[in-house]
Amino acid sequence: MTEAALVEGQVKLRDGKKWKSRWLVLRKPSPVADCLLMLVYKDKSERIKGLRERSSLTLEDICGLEPGLPYEGLVHTLAIVCLSQAIMLGFDSHEAMCAWDARIRYALGEVHRFHVTVAPGTKLESGPATLHLCNDVLVLARDIPPAVTGQWKLSDLRRYGAVPSGFIFEGGTRCGYWAGVFFLSSAEGEQISFLFDCIVRGISPTKGPFGLRPVLPDPSPPGPSTVEERVAQEALETLQLEKRLSLLSHAGRPGSGGDDRSLSSSSSEASHLDVSASSRLTAWPEQSSSSASTSQEGPRPAAAQAAGEAMVGASRPPPKPLRPRQLQEVGRQSSSDSGIATGSHSSYSSSLSSYAGSSLDVWRATDELGSLLSLPAAGAPEPSLCTCLPGTVEYQVPTSLRAHYDTPRSLCLAPRDHSPPSQGSPGNSAARDSGGQTSAGCPSGWLGTRRRGLVMEAPQGSEATLPGPAPGEPWEAGGPHAGPPPAFFSACPVCGGLKVNPPP
């Protein structure tokens, strides 16, 4: 499977002693291939018609690129340097040559070249040369067309580094014939050492982030027809961009207008979901529509939230009233960058408003849901403790004594061998007196337990009766639910705060 062409266009190829103009296509056989496939057509029409290429050549072991070499009467040439050969491409303009060079370099990877001078005393021929670095391959080339005079792999080098006015490296035994120390005189020794460090560590210094392709130059010559086609293409792209922008603005207009409609709409959608869940737990299916209508009224989510929390339980302190949330207070910028956050806040407030609506339906079915009359006042102050300084101990007026402790059951129980006397007998009155004295020292709930114990422990042959209450004590004082417990707090007459009452 062949990939799309890396670069194609009109170039000049050397055929014997002449330059011939051909339509050349360069592509990779596969995305991971390290070679290039060169397809040669006579002209562009054969390429468009899908005819077979005139010739093809696979360029393997590519070591580098060298543009701008004057060769056989052409100044604008590009040499594709391989280990065994060099392909010379001629161009009519400098721009076309640079465009082909940039596109081929991008396809090959890390391709660099440096002009150096080989020092004498090594296996290499001394004199000027070109150092080519293509990925992990290092070669030295000279002459026109370029010919490789030495080759190394970066992984086979023992050491390398920049020295004053040059660069030095040493090839190990795995380099074979090219083992040894070599010194290259160059003013770019630091840059060469830096590139070696990056490539050895797997870093691409010239590549951008993954997935971002740089803008590569167009290799086609800027003729009149090409300029017209480019202008038409730019106009078409502009129209497509304007159309997309208009569609985006039309789709995002309700959410980016800056009003409360987007907030209320998102709240209504979320409240429908919350109400559908709450309607399955209650016995009033009409709460769905009523609570949804309450949540659709956007300016009152805070009051509904306060009412919903007040209905949950009386033990929870009422929360502070929240101000109505407007879009200006949220800091919403646009529908694209803050829509998610706005939607999450609105769904939270709508769920509370739907819960408040269902609670109002349960407790006040006759009131209209969401009406301001059925909701508590938003500015109600919270009760606070008394701040008055503690004075002298005030005299407490004695009231009816409330029992707090129980007496041992063995003292309260009647003997089993005696039958309970009648209500009019003196023994009964004594029992009433003892019961009144006992009730003065034990709580009312324990009195009920004591009397139930008397009934259970009575003889089987006798009739089980409860002992009568004291003359000054009513029957309700002995029941388990005698009345409301004593108030622990009272309003301070001075500051109006809550004041802790002392135990009776």
Swiss-Prot record:
Positions of the PH domain: 4-109
Annotated PROSITE patterns: IRS_PTB (PS51064), PH_DOMAIN (PS50003)
Statement: the UniProt record of this protein carries the keyword Cell membrane: yes
Effect of S30W: Reduced stimulation of MUSK autophosphorylation
Membrane disposition: Peripheral membrane protein
Tissue-wise expression: Preferentially expressed in skeletal muscle and heart. Present in thigh muscle, diaphragm and heart but not in the liver or spleen (at protein level).
Outcome recorded upon mutating R158Q: In CMS10; results in a significant reduction of AChR clusters
Gene Ontology CC entries for this record: mitochondrion; neuromuscular junction; nucleoplasm; postsynaptic membrane
Protein localization: Cell membrane; Synapse
Biased composition (Low complexity): 263-279, 288-310
Keywords: Cell membrane, Congenital myasthenic syndrome, Disease variant, Lipid-binding, Membrane, Synapse
Residue ranges of every copy of the IRS-type PTB domain listed in the record: 105-210
Disease cited in the entry: Myasthenic syndrome, congenital, 10: A form of congenital myasthenic syndrome, a group of disorders characterized by failure of neuromuscular transmission, including pre-synaptic, synaptic, and post-synaptic disorders that are not of autoimmune origin. Clinical features are easy fatigability and muscle weakness affecting the axial and limb muscles (with hypotonia in early-onset forms), the ocular muscles (leading to ptosis and ophthalmoplegia), and the facial and bulbar musculature (affecting sucking and swallowing, and leading to dysphonia). Fetal akinesia deformation sequence 3: A clinically and genetically heterogeneous group of disorders with congenital malformations related to impaired fetal movement. Clinical features include fetal akinesia, intrauterine growth retardation, polyhydramnios, arthrogryposis, pulmonary hypoplasia, craniofacial abnormalities, and cryptorchidism. FADS3 inheritance is autosomal recessive.
Function in brief: Probable muscle-intrinsic activator of MUSK that plays an essential role in neuromuscular synaptogenesis. Acts in aneural activation of MUSK and subsequent acetylcholine receptor (AchR) clustering in myotubes. Induces autophosphorylation of MUSK.
Quaternary data: Homodimer. Forms a heterotetramer composed of 2 DOK7 and 2 MUSK molecules which facilitates MUSK trans-autophosphorylation on tyrosine residue and activation. Interacts (via IRS-type PTB domain) with MUSK (via cytoplasmic part); requires MUSK phosphorylation.
Protein name: Protein Dok-7
Native source organism of the sequence: Homo sapiens (Human)
Phylogenetic lineage: Eukaryota, Metazoa, Chordata, Craniata, Vertebrata
